[in-house]
Amino acid sequence: MDTEPNPGTSSVSTTTSSTTTTTITTSSSRMQQPQISVYSGSDRHAVQVIQQALHRPPSSAAQYLQQMYAAQQQHLMLHTAALQQQHLSSSQLQSLAAVQASLSSGRPSTSPTGSVTQQSSMSQTSINLSTSPTPAQLISRSQASSSTSGSITQQTMLLGSTSPTLTASQAQMYLRAQMLIFTPATTVAAVQSDIPVVSSSSSSSCQSAATQVQNLTLRSQKLGVLSSSQNGPPKSTSQTQSLTICHNKTTVTSSKISQRDPSPESNKKGESPSLESRSTAVTRTSSIHQLIAPASYSPIQPHSLIKHQQIPLHSPPSKVSHHQLILQQQQQQIQPITLQNSTQDPPPSQHCIPLQNHGLPPAPSNAQSQHCSPIQSHPSPLTVSPNQSQSAQQSVVVSPPPPHSPSQSPTIIIHPQALIQPHPLVSSALQPGPNLQQSTANQVQATAQLNLPSHLPLPASPVVHIGPVQQSALVSPGQQIVSPSHQQYSSLQSSPIPIASPPQMSTSPPAQIPPLPLQSMQSLQVQPEILSQGQVLVQNALVSEEELPAAEALVQLPFQTLPPPQTVAVNLQVQPPAPVDPPVVYQVEDVCEEEMPEESDECVRMDRTPPPPTLSPAAITVGRGEDLTSEHPLLEQVELPAVASVSASVIKSPSDPSHVSVPPPPLLLPAATTRSNSTSMHSSIPSIENKPPQAIVKPQILTHVIEGFVIQEGLEPFPVSRSSLLIEQPVKKRPLLDNQVINSVCVQPELQNNTKHADNSSDTEMEDMIAEETLEEMDSELLKCEFCGKMGYANEFLRSKRFCTMSCAKRYNVSCSKKFALSRWNRKPDNQSLGHRGRRPSGPDGAAREHILRQLPITYPSAEEDLASHEDSVPSAMTTRLRRQSERERERELRDVRIRKMPENSDLLPVAQTEPSIWTVDDVWAFIHSLPGCQDIADEFRAQEIDGQALLLLKEDHLMSAMNIKLGPALKICARINSLKES
């Protein structure tokens, strides 16, 4: 624990920017508003007060808290003006406001409500922070330190010996300079911690104030931050507690005390505990609100592992978090956190508890801790003792006090983090302290958890914290798993987990705790019904350490999924029946600790990414405050029978206040259980890879967070048979062709039904091509090449479906032209008129025509078909339809000419018998086309409008320069032209 304060210090400044997002803290916006709003008006006074409080002995802490509160009142009055100035001095104001909020909130937190700060902060001032996150971070960081007794030492260092008498501006400047100096060392930790504070305190104000909120949160949670500075934004909530805990070497105790009760603060064990605990309490209160929103989700991740937590933490504060937790919070409401706030005023404190993952390495843990922070306030409810938590205390305590939080829907903040905290062992070293504290200061416990062990990596076990304690009433069912101590301290006992997992653990339980300290928390817990009203998800999920990962994953998922309304289709049919049950925590016995940690990390990550919604039923349940009820199905899948093997997941009762009783929490299954059930969760857990600790959920809408993107699955799978482009086309095409067929010949009466729609088909070449392709698919039967007799599938043939290759089509054209030369020559006028007027060259038309011709006697069509097939087989994708039509018309005309000329060595053609000088452009085209290897070049002659006279004047350089004809063909053409001249 001693080491934690230092980390916390360093962490203070780090998180500002990331925390900004945390602002999501809106969940507790009502409660927290007071904290933040006050800032702008009287920053200077607040700074002075803070400095004084920092430097004064613990005995005078109460006075300074009162002073802070008075300053806060002034701030509220000045709030409007201050807001205007906000952008200018937002960072300073934020930090000051954060400090004040934390201090004042600490006082209120003493009272069950801790409403004073919250009430006053109800205003949206939290926004102040946003303007200049960096300065705000620095300031808030220093403030946070000052606000928490644990941080006092750090604060003193930062502020130096600044006398309380310094002018506000001086103090601010000094703070800034110190912050800047401090930043390098504590950059990550300090800044981050600050941000978390901001988020918690400013959560009330608004997301835009995220930065401010974060700063406030950081400030209030600064102590916690110190321990787990890294997680900055998310961490803010937990940070407050964690900082408190970390800073107080005995912080666990002191922070616990502070959490339990402001009064206990004075009781806090040793050192700065008294002041720190006070600050902690304050911070917790303010941050709780803020944190609650962000933290409640992130907490889930915290338990997974610090890295996951970090991600979650950051994401909640940032857009990602938005996806994971924050999304849900905001969507469902940041209130999910609010849920934790469920007691309208107390919620803030309850959030504080959340998780405090800082137990993990400072950097990663910070993120988690912040996430957890939301739960921090709840920590008091965390009754699980560290040891117990190890076993499976981790309950997903997501008891959002529904009544209070505006966005109760998200109530379900599961904070499976606790679950994740499988690492009780790691925390065991720390745990002992927490355990003692636990018994001594159950109230403080939550705080202790927070501090607990920012240094600890992933002692998930503490995570257990959550559940049981929170619901005293619920505890009986679920807490039993936790342990007597849990039940005893149900309201406060988050401390056990404090150690490494504490961060994770913290998150969950804190959420449950309402703003009220232990008492309120107990009442909330005891009254899951009340919570459920608001959609309280207060449920303790005790998970064996092994399961922790699963719980964690679930928690994480929920948050990730939360963002989307996520109608979790999961019907917790089994559980819903027992409203009281929600508190019930099921202990998972099958999971192995080792599995848990890994899984927590992986699951969290994986869950977050691919199947967040599915990831864990609990997560889903939590994630969708609105749909939590739906989520009950998860429980159903798990089946209470499996309870022994499953950890109870926090299930939020439907938003409906009517659901007084909290639906039974979804069960978190141990690895074994989860795996067995994984089958039942069809698509929900697909990407999770059947992580052992996954709960079974059948959400209607699956939401995945992958690479930072939230991906929602559709209610129905995409059709696999064909590409989406082709699915609609057949209808269009068929009608198109049918129209043509019917118009030309009344074949296939069935097609006539579709004819009406055919005319409306778009003229784009793409559609024509698609239509033709679809036709080919429709005629998938084997086709026989009319020239070479080769058999093949329709898709391998040319568009005309008559020839397997272009060479066959061309050869067939030649043979047909010879066969029908005479008959065609006789009918030339008709054919030409057809080509000019009647025939439509569009691809689909050609295909339709060929289709019709195939069905008609072959006497007349064969030659034309031949031409059509050739035309169709050479699609010009880049040309417009009009151009293609005109080109095809000309091609047909020229072909007719060619056919007249070519058959019988062109002796039969009148053109051949005439002087080349009187040839028309078409005659020249036919002549060039008849030359070997010059078929493609013939079109160029027509495009250049070369008639007989021009042809005789052509030279190689003309062909090469004007028509880009290669030298070989140009020489051949010129040789033939010369022969014409000679003849």
Swiss-Prot record:
Keyword Nucleus: yes
Amino acids binding Zn(2+): C785, C788, C804, C808
One example GO MF annotation: zinc ion binding
Signal peptide start-end: none
Location, primary (coarse class): nucleus
Sequence positions bearing Phosphothreonine: T609, T614
Biological process according to GO: negative regulation of DNA-templated transcription
Compartments where located: Nucleus
Residue spans of biased composition, Basic and acidic residues class: 258-271
Residue span(s) of domain SAM: 919-983
GO cellular component: nucleoplasm; nucleus; PcG protein complex; PRC1 complex
Region (Disordered) location: 1-34, 103-149, 225-283, 313-332, 339-410, 477-509, 601-620, 827-847, 864-889
Covalent crosslink: Glycyl lysine isopeptide (Lys-Gly) (interchain with G-Cter in SUMO2): K691, K732, K810
PROSITE patterns associated with the record: SAM_DOMAIN, ZF_FCS
Residue numbers of Phosphoserine PTMs: S263, S272, S315, S616, S761, S762
SUPFAM superfamilies: SAM/Pointed domain
Keywords, alphabetical: Developmental protein, DNA-binding, Isopeptide bond, Metal-binding, Nucleus, Phosphoprotein, Ubl conjugation, Zinc, Zinc-finger
Pfam families xref list: SAM_1, zf-FCS_1
Positions of short motif HD1: 691-720
Polar residues biased stretches: 127-139, 225-257, 274-283, 365-383, 477-489
Zn-finger segments (FCS-type): 776-810
Biased composition (Low complexity): 9-29, 103-126, 140-149, 384-398, 490-506
Subunit composition and interactions: Component of a PRC1-like complex.
Additional note from the record: The hPRC-H complex purification reported by PubMed:12167701 probably presents a mixture of different PRC1-like complexes.
Biological role stated in the UniProt entry: Component of a Polycomb group (PcG) multiprotein PRC1-like complex, a complex class required to maintain the transcriptionally repressive state of many genes, including Hox genes, throughout development. PcG PRC1 complex acts via chromatin remodeling and modification of histones; it mediates monoubiquitination of histone H2A 'Lys-119', rendering chromatin heritably changed in its expressibility.
Stated name of the protein: Polyhomeotic-like protein 3
Organism, scientific name: Homo sapiens (Human)
